[in-house]
Amino acid sequence: MVAIIPHASFTTIKLTQKTEGSQMPTEEICKINMRTRKFDVGGNSRDFECFYSNFVQTVILLGTFFYCVERLQPWSIVTADISYKQIFVNVFVVCLIMVGLIFTKYWQHGYKSLPKFDTIYSLYLPFMVSLLFDTSSTVINTILILSVLNSYRWRTQLVVIILQLCLIFFNFEAGDRLKNIISIVINSLLSLILKYIGQLKSLDNIDSNLFSILLTNILYVSEAGTVHFRILKGIILALTTIISINYVLKKVMHFKPFMLSISFAIGLPLFANTFIHLEDGENPLLWLVKYILESTIRQKILFAWSSILILSIPSILIEKDSLSLNTSRKLWHFIIFLLIIPSFQMDSNFVKIALSGTIPVFLSIEYIRFQNLPPLGSAIELQLRRFADDRDHSGPLIISYLYLLFGISTPLLMNNSPMGLIGLGIGDSLASIIGKRYGRIRWKGTQKTLEGTLAFIVTSFIVCLVLLRFDKAAIFNHLTTLQLLTLCTLSGVLEGNSVLNDNILIPAFMMICEKLITL
């Protein structure tokens, strides 16, 4: 693994004065200072703070990586699909390529061309998640990581694609090369589309590449084995298809929004019915109704969900003006936790199927809002803007609620793990509320507080202990109390020092740590 830690300082007196006089949050100041050249011997505390927060993150990430290497013994163990030796040699080569390309850009354009420190997560998260949960796709996912160095300059894109093709040639047999070349094409297109839609504001370069790799795996790389994954893959493929068709209808045939709404309403269920492949070939909607009716537990879960949402949504909307933005947003975290945890213990497969259907539904809601499709587009825009944060306001997309849904769903769908729910529903929520209200000691280099981090660790650990004690589904029976405490502590400290979106970082890292501990 390679940690990218740029030197922290300033370039000119003018830049330093401008930075110190601004009202930018500390993490934004760090991003500017870390791209400059000269070290501030005069004692600019923010420069040291940036280095400190990046150092803490690097220690945690490298520590978990080398622990993984030590446990897997890559030079001796061979899986049924691919050798761990090949996987780690490949990631080492990718790291060297990334360092080489970054150094070349620095040589040509100076410190301003260096990527953000958070670029390290574009390497760490896809590699570790793929290695621990889908080993057979680790090599291709590691190759796809190189796309994070792509830019709008065609020369850079061409160099990255050529390097990816070379890696495919050396890592795969002739029969597998075409499939993996198609993976590169799909990932590159998805990344460019996300960057274009998000304008590198709602979704920055790191977000776009992480989500493009995730979508590439869902749509193409990973095999759709379980029912919930087949449902997720089918609906997202249907959503992608109808959005593409609507784009052509709007740009080429100049369809009005009302006609696009009709096209979307008709096309999405038709394509979903086509792309969802169940084992018995049954109609997906009829299968779902039958699946729910054949179990009283599922009917009770569905009734409980409906009742809680009917009561909570109007209440939060009514009380929104009397609550702070942060508190009103975190209430949704608590509600989702209460909705899913008890239900998951009663019927985990039903919950995973429900989440697999909910993700495309929320993506559809954002598409309707983004395109302002009648009759719901304006109403959705009005309500979602009430809970939008600064990042949502900075770009065309309202992405925070989608981040939350992806964060809680991914560990459950991939590993039957409630870590995303615990980390976001309880730990992150209380860390934010307590940190903003009572926090006094700030982590160096961020706006987050030590008090908030302690709240994250303590509350997450307590919830884990409660689930360990009363968990009928045996979710945590494979973990000891000390292991749970270690997991919560590492996650809390990393969250406190990182400026990457919590809804991405916390669930993924906690899921990785949970798996590492049990290797």
From Swiss-Prot:
Classification via InterPro entries: Polypren_kinase
Family, as annotated: Belongs to the polyprenol kinase family.
GO CC annotation, single: endoplasmic reticulum membrane
Its membrane topology: Multi-pass membrane protein
Name by which UniProt lists this protein: Dolichol kinase
Enzyme class, broadest EC rank: transferase
EC number in record: 2.7.1.108
Gene: SEC59
Lumenal topological segments: 69-88, 140-151, 204-223, 275-294, 348-349, 416-417, 471-472
Transmembrane segments annotated in the record for this chain: 48-68, 89-109, 119-139, 152-172, 182-203, 224-244, 254-274, 295-315, 327-347, 350-370, 395-415, 418-438, 450-470, 473-493
Keyword set, alphabetical order: Endoplasmic reticulum, Kinase, Membrane, Transferase, Transmembrane, Transmembrane helix
Functional pathway: Protein modification; protein glycosylation
Cytoplasmic side: 1-47, 110-118, 173-181, 245-253, 316-326, 371-394, 439-449, 494-519
Disulfide-bonded cysteines: none
Highest taxon listed in the record's lineage: Eukaryota
Organism from which the protein derives: Saccharomyces cerevisiae (strain ATCC 204508 / S288c) (Baker's yeast)
GO molecular-function terms, A-Z: dolichol kinase activity
Subcellular localization(s) per the UniProt record: Endoplasmic reticulum membrane
Function: Catalyzes CTP-mediated phosphorylation of dolichol, the terminal step in de novo dolichyl monophosphate (Dol-P) biosynthesis. Dol-P is a lipid carrier essential for the synthesis of N-linked and O-linked oligosaccharides and for GPI anchors.
Any Gene Ontology biological process: dolichyl monophosphate biosynthetic process
Catalytic reaction list: a di-trans,poly-cis-dolichol + CTP = a di-trans,poly-cis-dolichyl phosphate + CDP + H(+)
